[in-house]
């Protein structure tokens, strides 16, 4: 009887579940259709597809047709990939101003930090000239900060008809840079900006990073790093054949002789190990085997960074043109280097020959500095104390009511709200909650 009773209850529950499913299914389907119908009213939107997600009620990928040159739409157009995580029309919206490609945001498990913290809609915008947002043909003259800001303005304009609530722009690293420059060009598009680890470089080789690396961490940490660099340079004759074999196996090609590439990997090492917060204790002793030393060098600053067909070519073009970059201090290593100078390595190693005469334009950095000094928009900058990019951060901004700069003690390029101390985290969250409730 008990078994029969349990069985009957299960049958009743199953039937109820089926009825419930039938009742609920059309509602979610109509909600899905409703979103697609709403966004399709914008004729510049095409190719809308639903995506699997475990983090949003609904998620879509779509393309916005954008002018190559927003000042001269007659020059042609390209399709920009946009990924939308939909929560609700009454929720705040986070626009992620990605600095590179958007491939990783397609993952079902992906959700950006702020959209999760505030249960907000997410609009993730792939940067022009990366992955599926690359124009055909690829004419580099239209890859400018101003055009990228105009792209974001067009995306925001398209989606504000759906999401009339508060808007936050955010991005990480180059995406943080993009969020900053977007606010400069269109200060009223969003209510709040949260750039993470965003540099503001003043030159192709900015000059502030090398002194930073001479001060960061402890003296013992810096000595261990430099000792490792010197050791792999001293053993270059022994390590270079294996380095070359690995490059050959991976079909890497470079714009400079292999020994120079090896030298640049060693120069890059100190920047890279601090940038990503690698445990200094993981650095091998100078007495370690050849294989141990080379494996560690390749893991921290491998040669793929310098290859001819780099997936980051679009970024190097932007860095050389107006975003700026960093240089290397070669003085401690000069006796062991095959190069006499590292100056202008970005143009020589990273850019195609026909672009090497491109001059750096300071107009953008001057415009951003002027904007930050004269204005006080609601912005939160987040940096890591040990991240070399912080050398070019806006940590000099003082005495602002709305602009806040947080530096995570001991933090790296991975500094986020979630990695902060409880005290810092509470301050950031309190600011954001207050602004969203205004």
Regions found by a protein language model. Give the residues of each.
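Alpha/beta-hydrolase fold nucleophile elbow
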Residues: 163-173
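Alpha/beta-hydrolase fold active-site neighborhood
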Residues: 245-361
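Short beta-strand/loop motif that positions the catalytic acidic residue
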Residues: 381-383
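Alpha/beta-hydrolase active-site loop
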Residues: 142-161
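Conserved alpha/beta-hydrolase
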Residues: 115-132
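Single conserved hydrophobic/aromatic residue that forms the stacking wall/gate
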Residues: 1-14
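Catalytic-loop region of hydrolases
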Residues: 31-120, 423, 430-438
């Amino acid at each position: 009887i008990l078994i029969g009773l349990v069985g009957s209850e299960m049958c009743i529950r199953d039937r109820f579940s089926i009825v419930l499913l039938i009742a609920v299914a059309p509602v979610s389907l109509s909600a899905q259709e409703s979103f697609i119908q709403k966004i399709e009213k914008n004729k510049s939107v095409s190719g809308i597809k639903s995506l699997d997600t475990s983090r949003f009620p609904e998620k879509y990928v779509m393309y916005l047709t954008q002018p190559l040159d927003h000042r001269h739409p007659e020059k042609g157009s390209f399709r920009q990939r946009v990924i939308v995580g939909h929560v609700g029309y009454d929720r705040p919206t986070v626009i992620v101003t990605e600095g590179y490609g958007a491939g990783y945001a397609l993952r079902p498990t992906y959700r950006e930090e702020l959209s999760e913290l505030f249960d907000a809609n997410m609009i993730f915008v792939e940067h022009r000239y990366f992955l599926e947002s690359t124009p055909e043909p690829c004419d580099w003259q239209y890859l400018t900060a101003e055009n990228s800001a105009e792209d974001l303005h067009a995306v925001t304009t398209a989606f504000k008809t759906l999401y009339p609530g508060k808007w936050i722009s955010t991005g990480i690293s180059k995406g943080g840079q993009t969020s900053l420059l977007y606010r400069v060009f269109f200060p009223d598009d969003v209510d709040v900006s949260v750039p993470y680890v965003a540099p503001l470089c003043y030159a192709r080789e900015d000059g502030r990073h090398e002194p930073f690396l001479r001060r960061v961490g402890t003296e013992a940490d810096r000595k261990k790093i430099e000792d490792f660099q010197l050791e792999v340079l001293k053993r270059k004759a022994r390590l270079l054949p294996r380095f070359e074999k690995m490059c050959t196996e991976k079909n890497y090609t470079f714009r400079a002789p292999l020994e120079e590439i090896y030298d640049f990997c060693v120069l890059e090492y100190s920047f890279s190990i601090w940038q990503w917060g690698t445990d200094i204790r993981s650095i091998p002793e100078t007495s370690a085997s050849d294989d141990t030393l080379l494996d560690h060098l390749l893991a921290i600053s491998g040669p793929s960074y310098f290859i001819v067909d780099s997936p980051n070519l679009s970024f190097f073009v932007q860095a050389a043109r107006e975003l700026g970059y960093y240089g290397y201090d070669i003085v401690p290593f000069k006796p062991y280097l095959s190069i006499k100078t590292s100056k202008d390595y970005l143009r020589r190693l990273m850019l195609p020959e026909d672009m090497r005469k491109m001059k750096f334009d300071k107009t953008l950095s001057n415009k951003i500095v002027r904007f930050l000094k004269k204005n006080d928009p609601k912005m939160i900058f987040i940096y890591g104390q040990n991240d070399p990019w912080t050398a070019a951060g806006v940590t000099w901004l003082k005495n602002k009511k709305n602009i806040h700069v947080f530096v995570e003690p001991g933090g790296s390029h991975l500094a986020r709200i979630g990695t902060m101390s409880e005290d810092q985290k509470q301050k950031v969250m309190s600011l954001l909650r207050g602004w969203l409730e205004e």
